Regions:
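Active-site helix of classical SDR
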Residues: 121, 157, 165
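Residue(s) in the substrate-gating loop at a strand-loop-helix junction
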Residues: 141
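Short C-terminal tail/terminal secondary-structure segment
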Residues: 146, 238, 249-264
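Short, small/polar-rich loop/turn modules that mediate ligand/substrate recognition or access, typified
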Residues: 173, 178, 248-250
Length: 264
């Protein structure tokens, strides 16, 4: 299916690995010219080259920067003053006891997971409204709806993503611009693979059974009882980025494998 994304310019933050990289690949597969972002220039260049080889008819570019830093964002804006699609994927997480979270850590999570995406949306939204097309997508988490006690500082910011996206969608009324949030469930990224290795490397469970054991014992509410693959999130995000996804805005979209037990 042609999603109508050919030659659309898409900025995907935090796109050198994991879900962000998968989103960038699927957008490029649909013909979009993606801007790859990450903090390490070598990692950014590597992904740009990979996508160029995979999809030679597209024009991927790199924007190495820590977009939690305001000066880095200003440099990005000078280099890329307009985009058609903004995917705010960049974020940090860290399991921590509530009692051990310092004020500085709360501030850091808010700055990285909320304010960076807010600043990008504030800059790029006016052009989208002017051209009467645009997509802003926040990548949140099922933790936005089902906060755990393992990392409250992370859960809080993901819930804030939902609220922010809903508020921004009010500014697009009557236009072809949409603002939505996607909430992935537990996904087999490089970080999760490393977590599984750390959890099970001393156990008697065979590596090929780690995933099933993890889902059974740590994600029992999942209806699919497997980890979601990054490319599944990527394909869904590509659709939400497309002109075909024009009938909803301000939505909190679940791609969680049925992990969240509520209807609404």
């Amino acid at each position: 299916m042609d999603l109508g994304l050919k030659n659309k310019r898409a900025l995907v933050t935090g796109s050198t690995k994991g879900i962000g990289k998968a989103i960038a690949i699927e957008l490029a597969r649909e013909g979009a010219n993606v801007i790859i972002n990450g903090r390490q220039p070598d990692d950014v260049a590597k992904v740009v080259n990979e996508i160029q080889e995979m999809f030679p008819n597209t024009k991927p570019e790199g924007a190495p920067a820590d977009l939690a830093d305001s000066s880095a964002r200003e440099e990005l804006f000078r280099g890329y003053p307009e985009v058609d699609i903004l995917v705010n994927n960049m974020g940090i997480f860290q399991p921590m006891s509530y009692w051990d979270i310092s004020d500085e850590t709360w501030d850091k999570f808010f700055k990285v997971n909320v304010m960076s995406g807010n600043a990008l949306a504030k800059f790029y939204l006016p052009h989208m409204l002017e051209q009467d097309f645009g997509r802003i997508i926040f990548i949140a988490s099922e933790e936005a709806l089902m906060p755990s006690g393992e990392m409250p500082q992370y859960s809080m910011t993901k819930t804030m993503n939902l609220s922010l996206a809903k508020s921004l969608s009010k500014l697009t009324k009557g236009t072809q611009v949409t603002v939505n949030t996607i909430m992935p469930g537990s996904t087999l990224t490089e970080g999760v693979q490393e977590m599984l290795e750390n959890m099970y490397h001393d156990s008697s469970i065979a590596p090929e059974d780690w995933e099933a054991d993890f889902m059974k014992n740590h994600r029992p509410l999942s209806q699919i009882q497997r980890l979601i693959r990054p490319e599944e999130i990527g394909r869904f995000t590509a659709f939400v980025s497309s002109p075909f996804a024009s009938s909803f805005s301000g939505a909190a979209l679940r791609v969680d494998g049925g992990l969240v037990p509520t209807i609404f």
